[in-house]
């Protein structure tokens, strides 16, 4: 989505990562009802629009097995970049001289910083109960929602330096590419054309080398065949000369 001027915030990136982790772990999570708890103590308290999500049951052995799969980080990276695209964040995949693009930068960031141990710990933090306690008199609680899923994972990620490094890196990468394509649109086009031109030139050189190789092989085979014909012709000439001499 080149040319987008949208800025991706640290909070938004954290939510995207936590949502992606949750989605990747859904096979290990089942919903359980009846474990959430709301306690209201005191007089004159008013609660309006207070909701609780269903609690979660987590299979920790499933989580451990899942995060250690060879393609887990790759799938997670794909999920994150797809979520970035879905939220109208500039994901340009413009090419530089080294053929690196935004998605590659994000993948490398995740592989370096977002370890399977960290992911496993944050997903495991889903276990337990949601508790909302209101004490005292005259309290007003409105539009309170307890979320036990992406938000808990998000809070866990914000407490880890590695996760913060990942989130910061992805945010900066997205904003960097977004700024590049929006503020330097013609430079972006020029770079893309230049990259394509370089690829064409490389392909042309390869084709020329292949043609030269074919010519060299053809010349070698042709010369060899001609040399063999000359060698076969020499005895015939000699025999003809001898016959002529004998007749004379």
From Swiss-Prot:
<keyword id="KW-0946">Virion</keyword>
<dbReference type="GO" id="GO:0016020">
    <property type="term" value="C:membrane"/>
</dbReference>
<keyword id="KW-1231">Capsid inner membrane protein</keyword>
<comment type="subunit">
    <text>Interacts with A151R.</text>
</comment>
<feature type="lipid moiety-binding region" description="N-myristoyl glycine; by host">
    <location>
        <position position="2"/>
    </location>
</feature>
<keyword id="KW-0519">Myristate</keyword>
<dbReference type="InterPro" id="IPR003472">
    <property type="entry name" value="Virion_mem_poxvirus_L1"/>
</dbReference>
<keyword id="KW-0472">Membrane</keyword>
<protein>
    <recommendedName>
        <fullName>Inner membrane protein pE248R</fullName>
    </recommendedName>
</protein>
<keyword id="KW-1043">Host membrane</keyword>
<comment type="function">
    <text>Essential for viral fusion with host endosomal membrane and core release.</text>
</comment>
<keyword id="KW-0812">Transmembrane</keyword>
<keyword id="KW-1133">Transmembrane helix</keyword>
<dbReference type="GO" id="GO:0033644">
    <property type="term" value="C:host cell membrane"/>
</dbReference>
<comment type="similarity">
    <text>Belongs to the asfivirus E248R family.</text>
</comment>
<feature type="transmembrane region" description="Helical">
    <location>
        <begin position="200"/>
        <end position="220"/>
    </location>
</feature>
<feature type="topological domain" description="Cytoplasmic">
    <location>
        <begin position="2"/>
        <end position="199"/>
    </location>
</feature>
<dbReference type="GO" id="GO:0055036">
    <property type="term" value="C:virion membrane"/>
</dbReference>
<keyword id="KW-0449">Lipoprotein</keyword>
<keyword id="KW-0735">Signal-anchor</keyword>
<dbReference type="Pfam" id="PF02442">
    <property type="entry name" value="L1R_F9L"/>
</dbReference>
<dbReference type="GO" id="GO:0039641">
    <property type="term" value="C:viral inner membrane"/>
</dbReference>
<feature type="topological domain" description="Extracellular">
    <location>
        <begin position="221"/>
        <end position="248"/>
    </location>
</feature>
